[in-house]
A protein has these predicted regions:
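Alpha-helix-loop-beta-strand connector modules within alpha/beta enzyme cores
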Residues: 57-78, 114-129, 174-201
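Conserved beta-strand positions in the central sheet of alpha/beta enzyme cores
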Residues: 48-51, 78, 101-102, 125, ...
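Glycine/small-residue-rich loop that forms an oxyanion/phosphate-binding "nest" at active or ligand-binding sites
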Residues: 53, 61-118
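Conserved, mostly hydrophobic/aromatic
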Residues: 8, 39, 47, 92, ...
């Protein structure tokens, strides 16, 4: 299982939200490139970046920072947040990003998703953000009508290979992961599943590894020191 340490960007800073709430934002660093270099120095091979401003407004205000990280590290980079057209996908891939995560766009515009998959194949992943059992959109501020399992089935049928599944109720709350959700998804679908939200302890990392998931994202737990990145990487080797 791969470990994806996370950088959430807002106003060119590294931040974390509590349960997806923009009014509960903590700034952890004003130097995202240094944070990414720290990940690499700890042994990480990949990184998960979310542009929270992009997710909220559908723009790319932090593109330059992502580009700096791509140019100055050897990390495999996946990026999500506000990517709602082919032009934005191209911008990210052209600046050195390896995989682009579609969230809202995959839910509300499946013709666009099909086009993106057709053009870029496995460079496209889909973020499945779950709130009260339904898939959330627009920076987690609205809920769609899709149930999580129905939506994952649809994604698989459209040719999506890789999903990042976040339980919003767990995200940033440091209360553990929704192991049952990931267990059910991995049994039902042949998707590469990355778990996100609530990975708080080394035990969480190990229990996700035992589900044979593709990846796990570590965010707040790294920033507050409850998981050492080296320990997490060691645990999944």
């Amino acid at each position: 299982m791969l470990i994806f340490p996370a950088i959430d960007l807002y106003d060119k800073k590294v931040v974390r939200l509590y349960k997806g709430d923009y009014s509960q934002m903590t700034i952890y660093s004003e130097n995202p490139l240094q944070v990414a270099k720290d990940f690499q120095n700890a042994g990480a091979t990949c990184i998960h970046i979310v542009d929270l401003e992009g997710a909220k407004f559908g723009t790319t205000p932090n593109l330059e920072i992502v580009k700096q990280i791509a140019q100055n590290t050897r990390l495999f980079i996946e990026v999500g947040g506000g990517i709602r057209n082919i032009e934005t996908i191209k911008k990210y891939l052209d600046c050195g990003v390896n995989r682009v995560i579609l969230g809202t766009a995959a839910v509300i515009d499946q013709e666009f998703l099909k086009k993106a998959l057709n053009l870029y194949g496995d460079k496209i992943a889909v973020g499945v953000d779950v709130k009260d059992g339904l898939v959330a959109i627009k920076g987690w501020e609205e809920k769609s009508t899709y149930d999580c399992y129905e939506f994952c089935g649809l994604m698989q049928s459209l040719g999506v290979k890789n999903i990042i599944c976040t339980d919003i109720s767990k995200d940033g709350a440091m209360q553990g992961t929704n192991r049952q959700l990931y267990q059910e998804l991995s049994k039902m679908f042949s998707l590469d599943i990355t778990a996100s939200g609530g990975v708080s302890t080394l035990d969480d990392v190990i229990s996700l590894k035992n589900l044979n998931l593709y990846g796990a994202i570590i965010g707040k737990a790294y920033y507050i020191g409850s998981i050492k990145l080296q320990d997490a990487l060691e645990a999944v080797r």
